[in-house]
């Protein structure tokens, strides 16, 4: 088969070579098509004037139970719940809602970020991702899709593709999981951490010994998470 293929190539190219004429065997084409993104999201912007460099931004991805078209469902857990109860964060919080039957798509989330950045004064060196359960998976996936865009990520009770570990070695990562999680085993998070470590990265991981699937409540109520995030900035290309 290999020999036959080589012969065919020579036969087909021979007239081109002998003719002395330049023949373009491959044409260049460009697809330009706008793809509609129809996802609603919550945005919380601090009331104060933004810092000179702009507001940091945290993207929050909810779990499977909050999918749908009722945006109020997004307020059930995590930062949106805290904000609804009066919590004031010193950064912009963006909380999209994934339509039912769909999953978190990186290109859609990137489009949302672009739109929010266009409409607000945002420090693009301090953009963070966090999410719980399905949103934890979405956090890993989006970070691997565009690791150079983010300053830090905090996936909670999620998991990802361990082959992506090498893409995340320069990204600050703090992972959270409950040891007794029967929905998404803690091994999903542990394997991602191990993959990053094997590739040369240094992620953090917190395993709550007596927590089940809901380890996000105590995580999002812990001020240390936000302090850690806000101390991280996107790496410059020269630092890589």
Residue spans for each PLM region:
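Sec-dependent N-terminal signal peptides
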Residues: 2-17
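A domain-start/cap signature at the N-terminus of enzymes
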Residues: 18-57, 91, 130-132, 137, ...
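Gly/Ser-rich "nucleophile elbow"/oxyanion-hole loop immediately N-terminal to the catalytic nucleophile
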Residues: 47-53, 101-134, 147
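Active-site machinery of serine-nucleophile hydrolases
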Residues: 57, 61-110
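Short, proline-enriched alpha-helix->beta-strand connector loops that line the catalytic pocket
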Residues: 89-91, 168-173
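Primarily recognizes the serine-hydrolase "nucleophile elbow" in alpha/beta-hydrolase
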Residues: 117-119, 125-169
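C-terminal catalytic histidine-bearing segment of alpha/beta-hydrolase fold enzymes
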Residues: 172-240
């Amino acid at each position: 088969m290999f020999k036959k293929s080589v012969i065919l190539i020579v036969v087909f190219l021979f007239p081109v070579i002998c003719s002395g004429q330049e023949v373009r065997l491959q044409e260049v084409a460009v697809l330009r098509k706008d793809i509609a993104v129809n996802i609603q999201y919550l945005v919380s912007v601090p009331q104060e004037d933004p810092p000179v460099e702009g507001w940091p931004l945290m993207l929050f991805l909810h779990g499977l139970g909050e999918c749908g078209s009722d945006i109020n469902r997004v307020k059930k857990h995590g930062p949106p719940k805290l904000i609804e109860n009066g919590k004031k964060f010193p950064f912009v919080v963006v909380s999209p809602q994934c339509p039912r039957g769909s999953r978190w798509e990186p290109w859609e989330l990137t489009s949302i970020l672009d739109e929010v950045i266009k409409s607000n004064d945002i420090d693009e060196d301090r953009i963070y991702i966090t999410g719980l359960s399905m949103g934890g998976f979405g956090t890993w996936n989006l970070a691997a899709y565009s690791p150079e865009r983010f300053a830090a990520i905090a996936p909670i009770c999620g998991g990802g593709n361990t082959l992506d570990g090498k893409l995340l070695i320069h990204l600050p990562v703090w992972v959270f999981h409950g040891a007794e999680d029967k929905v998404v085993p803690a091994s999903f998070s542990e394997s991602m951490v191990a993959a990053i470590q094997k590739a040369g990265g240094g992620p953090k991981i917190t395993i709550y010994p007596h927590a089940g699937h809901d380890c996000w409540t105590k995580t999002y109520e812990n001020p240390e998470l936000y302090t850690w995030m806000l101390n991280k900035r996107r790496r410059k290309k020269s630092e890589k």
